[in-house]
């Protein structure tokens, strides 16, 4: 069934997601903070809106929120570069506008950083012990949205995002050394991010939480060295033996949606 969908934040994930949903027959609106991106969205037949979300409100054309069946909040926190930023208050503003516009279904893109450095196999029922500023604020955002009776929210806790132009190895290879060599990777490819969201859209959105991590967990040392060789990058220099051995499980989503991951080996060529 065709839906009227708004993608709030047409960035690295939001833009290709909006393109895919449009090709799937949905009516798609997309927001950006960049004026230069508006014409690009328009050229792709995505209805464009210039919007800027801050802790104090949302500036721009609020017509973006009109008559939406579903909104996907895909705004990256970007708290590493701006640790004083109040992403949680930004999402609070989004919540208010969604209520004002009678939006009933929300998908919120969160992160596995909400688990902090917990060890073991982590499920959606695991304790949340975020250590980073981003992780702490994302927990607040999740609680804010799922406890709003005016709409239903599905939270997607994405692992580390990778794609053709994005991979942790590009940064790891620049570091003097990288710790936790025997820890497990918990990543997900852009293709699977989009397909998981599409699977959700084809059903009624309900209050729920899903981990979204490819069920492929080699050691960091083995995986990043192999991918570096494959991509022609400098290998990361691993140091230390202290291991945070965690494995984020996506079994719940796989079970509920009979989902099969598309990029099974995280770009590793067998």
Where are these regions (language model features)?
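N-terminal Rossmann-fold NAD(P) dinucleotide-binding loop
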Residues: 14-15
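Conserved N-terminal Rossmann-fold NAD(P)-binding element of oxidoreductases
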Residues: 5-9
């Amino acid at each position: 069934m065709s839906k009227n969908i708004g993608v709030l934040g047409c960035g690295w994930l939001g833009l290709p997601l909006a393109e895919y949903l449009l090709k799937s027959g949905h009516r798609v609106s997309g927001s950006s903070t960049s004026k230069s991106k508006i014409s690009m969205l328009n050229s792709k037949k995505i209805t464009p809106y210039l919007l800027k979300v801050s802790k104090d409100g949302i500036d721009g054309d609020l017509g973006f929120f009109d008559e939406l069946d579903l909104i996907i909040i895909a705004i990256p926190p970007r708290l590493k570069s701006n640790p004083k930023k109040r992403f949680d208050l930004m999402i609070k503003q989004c919540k208010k506008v969604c209520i004002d516009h009678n939006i009933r279904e929300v998908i919120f893109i969160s992160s596995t950083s909400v688990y902090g450095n917990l060890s073991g196999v982590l499920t959606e029922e695991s304790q949340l012990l975020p250590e980073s500023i981003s992780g702490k604020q994302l927990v607040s955002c999740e609680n804010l949205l799922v406890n709003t009776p005016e709409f239903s929210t599905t939270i997607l806790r994405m692992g580390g995002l990778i794609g053709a132009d994005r991979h942790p190895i590009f940064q790891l290879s620049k570091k003097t050394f990288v710790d936790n060599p025997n820890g497990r990777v918990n990543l997900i490819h852009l293709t699977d991010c989009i397909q998981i969201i599409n699977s959700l859209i084809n059903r009624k959105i309900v209050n729920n939480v899903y981990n979204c991590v490819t069920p492929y967990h080699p050691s960091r040392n083995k995986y990043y060295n192999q991918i570096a060789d494959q991509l022609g990058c400098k290998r990361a220099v691993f140091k230390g033996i202290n291991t945070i051995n965690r494995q984020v499980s996506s079994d719940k989503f796989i079970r509920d949606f009979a989902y099969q991951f598309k990029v099974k080996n995280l770009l590793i060529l067998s």
